[in-house]
Amino acid sequence: MKTAIFGFAGSGKTELFQALAGPGSEHNDRAMVKVPEPRLTPLVDLFKPKKVTPTEIEYLDLPGGSTKGEGLGQRVLNAVRPYDCLLAVLDHFSGLSDPDSQHRSIETDMIIADLAVVEKRLERIAQDKRKAKNLVDPKEESLLEQVQAVLEDEKPLRGDPDLSSRPELRGFCFLSAKPILYIWNVTEDNLEAEVTAEHAGEAHLAICAKLERELAEIEDPDEQQAFLEDLGIQASALKVIISKAYELLDLITFLTAGEKEVRAWAIPKG
């Protein structure tokens, strides 16, 4: 699973990336992170395999977008297209910007970018139709017109899963169709902050990236747990974000075991 982490300049996205990637990530923008899976341990004890392979998530820390209110910028929008899941970090700690407005700005940027892709393709189809009708796939044209209607209504495509999941549209890599997890980066004394109601294909979490980075620097698991308990946090951001990402992508973990290898696989639910 490939997840892109992005946000406006000063949102704290790099601090969150470092919390997820762990110690030694200060000079990197890409990390492979093992998915915690406690069910592997008894299987390893039973089979004593030569190899143990947990599931991994690739995180990419993208360059910061423009200043809040000026949009993400084309560079960021282009960079997130190949990724399976998006993780957008919203500033809810500085008091300089409203997270709801940041959320709306990100959604608007993605919708506009998708609309440009659709309009360009429909223009090409119209040109081909003028040359010869047999050059045009009427099914593709109809689907793109449906996509265009949703986007012109200023709605993200993920809100229409029946349309956005059509295999004929997969090659377009529409941004607003991608599952997205919004992280409200809060202060230490605002961990219980209320976040925006979730919409189809998106989720919202309140997390203090600064605290989570400090937690990631603690190597001893018992000390990590004591740190969480002192703060009244049930689970680390690493576990919570992975769990939410699996929900958004509709994935489950499947285990296989034998003397050669015990392995965890991320597979579609059902």
Predicted features, each with a name:
Residues 1-17, 21-22, 28, 124-270:
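C-terminal-of-GTPase-core extension/linker across diverse P-loop GTPases
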Residues 57-59, 83-84, 112, 228-233:
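Glycine-rich loops and low-complexity Gly/Arg-rich segments
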Residues 53-54, 96, 213-218:
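Short, exposed beta-strand "edge-strand" segments with a Pro/Gly-rich flavor and a Y/T-containing core
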Residues 50-52, 76-80, 105-108, 200-203, ...:
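Short, low-complexity, polar/charged sequence segments that are solvent-exposed and flexible
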Residues 1-94:
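Conserved G1/Walker A P-loop phosphate-binding module
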